[in-house]
Amino acid sequence: MYKVVVQLSSNDILVQKATISQLNNILNAFESIEVEVVMNGLGIDLILTESLYHHTLERLHEKGIQFLVCKNTLNHRNLGNTSILPFASIVPSAIAHFIIRQHEGWSYIKAGF
């Protein structure tokens, strides 16, 4: 099975749209794939409770995509766990998560253009 971890660190609306498109393309290209989207820095804006893409992200989650948020970023921005959409999970450190996943053989993609 293929495994990919995607980093989103931008809150640019065009990058967010491109990321959603890329996620759909990944799902359409592979019958069996594990996908994690890890958001850190300004990228967490996509998964905040007031996100314009709430329903789109929820549908992607229902198709198996995991959305992970950096706890360090939440702390830095003084946001609590309830600030993110309920289907998202929290990782202690996005950077550490990327290192772990790459060590485990996961592919890494920087979201956007």
What would you call each of these model-derived segments?
Residues 1-3, 33-34:
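Loop/turn elements at helix/coil->beta-strand transitions in domains of secreted/extracellular proteins
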Residues 7-17, 45-48:
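Short, glycine-rich nucleotide/cofactor-binding loops
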Residues 11-12, 43, 73-76:
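Solvent-exposed loop/turn segments at secondary-structure junctions
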Residues 35-40, 67-71:
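Short internal beta-strands
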Residues 2-4, 12, 25-26:
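Secretory/periplasmic and organellar redox-cofactor proteins
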Residues 3-9, 38-40:
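Short glycine-rich or small-residue beta-strand-to-loop segments that form or flank ligand, phosphate
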Residues 52-113:
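A cross-taxonomic marker for long C-terminal extensions/tails that follow the last structured domain
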Residues 15-30:
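Histidine-anchored nucleotide/phosphate-binding helix
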